[in-house]
UniProtKB/Swiss-Prot annotation:
The gene is mnmE. Its cofactor is K(+). This is tRNA modification GTPase MnmE. Residues 228-394 form the TrmE-type G domain. GTP binds at residues 238-243, 257-263, 282-285. GO terms for molecular function: GTP binding; GTPase activity; metal ion binding. It is an enzyme of class 3 (hydrolase). Signal peptide: none annotated. Pfam families: MMR_HSR1, MnmE_helical, TrmE_N. PANTHER family: TRNA MODIFICATION GTPASE GTPBP3, TRNA MODIFICATION GTPASE GTPBP3, MITOCHONDRIAL.
Amino acid sequence: MRNSLSFQDEPIVALATPLGVGALAVVRMSGQGVFDIARKVFHKQGAPDFHLASSKGFQAHFGTIHDAQGVVDEVIALVFRSPRSFTMEDMVEFSCHGGPVVVQHLLKALIDAGCRLAEPGEFTRRAFLNGRIDLLQAEAIGEMIHARSESAFRTAVTQMQGRLSRQLEEMREKLLHSCALLELELDFSEEDVEFQNREELREDVQRLQGEINRLLDSYQHGRLLKEGVATVLVGSPNAGKSTLLNALLGEERSIVSHQPGTTRDYIEEPLLLGSTLFRLIDTAGLREGEEEVEHEGIRRSYRKIAEADVVLYLLDVSHPDYCNELSDITSLLEQASPNVQLLLVANKCDAITNPTERLAQLQAAMPQATVCGIAAKEGDGLEALKQQMSNMVAGLDKLHEASVLITSMRHYEALRRASDALENGACLVAEHAETELVAFELRSALEAVGEITGKVVNDEILSLIFERFCIGK
C-alpha cells in the first residue's frame, strides 16, 4: 500500500457498487485533473464542446462514454467540486448500465485517460487525510456497510455522525489544557511557579479517568452489537444439536444422523432475532472420541465454549441418565468466561409424560440457568426458545440510543492505556512527584485518546483500517 501520510491527489477511479449484473453501476473518480480526464472520454449529448470543469457542483449531465473503439455506454455524469465532496477533492461519478463488461470498458477508458485504479478504502482514506472525517468516523463507515443487524447499523451510524468523536475530543481538550499548564511549569522550573493547583489537577485527572472507564465498560455490549451474540450449542452426541440448529435457521445447514460423532467441527451460522444478531455455533458432541479427527473437533468445541457469550446446553430429557450430565454442565461452565449465560434446553419433551415437572426439577437443580423445553425434531417450543434467547440480551438493541458505545478492540486498547496513564498520573500527583513525571503520564493519555480519532496516527494503523474496505469505498 502507498504511503498514506504523504499528500496524495493523483486521480483515482473505482467501481463504487457491487460487481455483477444490475440495473445500474456507479464508477467514481477523485483527485486532481478528474475533469480533464472526463473530457477525454465523456461527450455530453447535444453539446460536443462541453467540459465538466465548467459545471457547477452537484449537477448531473447526460452523455456517452467513448474509448478507442467507439461508444461504450450512455451515462449520467455527476459533478462534485472540491471541497464539497466526500474526499474534499474534485470528484465525478458516472452512472452506467450495470453489467460487468460495461463496467470493465468504462474503467479501462478512464485508466487509459490518466486515472489510477484505487486501492481498498482509498476514497475514505482521502476523506480522513483531507479532514472531511476523523479516523473513528472512517471506521464507522466500514462498520455501517458491513453491519448484519439493525442494532449494529444504528450504532455505526451514531459513530459516523460524530457522537463518540465529540466526547473524545472534549476529553482530549481537557488533557491538552492540563498538559500545557504542566509544560509551562517545566519551562519556568527555576522560578518554582505552580500554574495548576495539584488537588484540582488530581480531581480533574480522576474525573477524566472515570469518563474513560465508563466507555471501557460499554465495550462488552458494543462488541455484542457489532459482532453478534456468540451462542454455542453444546451437549452430548445425539442430543439433537444439529436438529435444533436446522430448526432455528429454517434450513438444512447441519447434517443430522443417529450415528454419534457426526459433527466433527463447529458450524457457525447467523440468526437474527428482532434487531439482535446471534451467531449460532454447532459444536461436536462432548464425549471421549474414538478417532483423532473427532478428538480435534471436541478440542475446538471447548475453545468455542471459552469464547461464548451464551452456552445453549441441549439435554436429552428422554434419556434415563440425563441427570448425570448436570455435574458435567457445572464443570463445563468453569471453562467459559465469567460473564457467560447458560441456557439449558430440555430436548425431546414430547417423549416424556411429565415435561412441566421435569423442567421445574432442572430449574431447581441449575438455578443459574435459564431453562426451556422443546421438541426440536417436531419444532415444538422453538418460538418460546427464541424469546428466551432474546430475553437474555434484553435492552441490548436499545443501548445505541441512550449510550455512547465502544465497539472496536482498537478503541478499547487505546482507552485502556489512557486510563492506566491517568491512574498513574493521579497517584503521582497525590505523592507530590516531580512535575515531569506527571506530565509524562498525561501526555501518554493524550496520545492514546488521539490515536482513536486520528489526531495521533501512523501509516501502519491506517493500512490496517482501510485495507478492510472495498475498492470503491
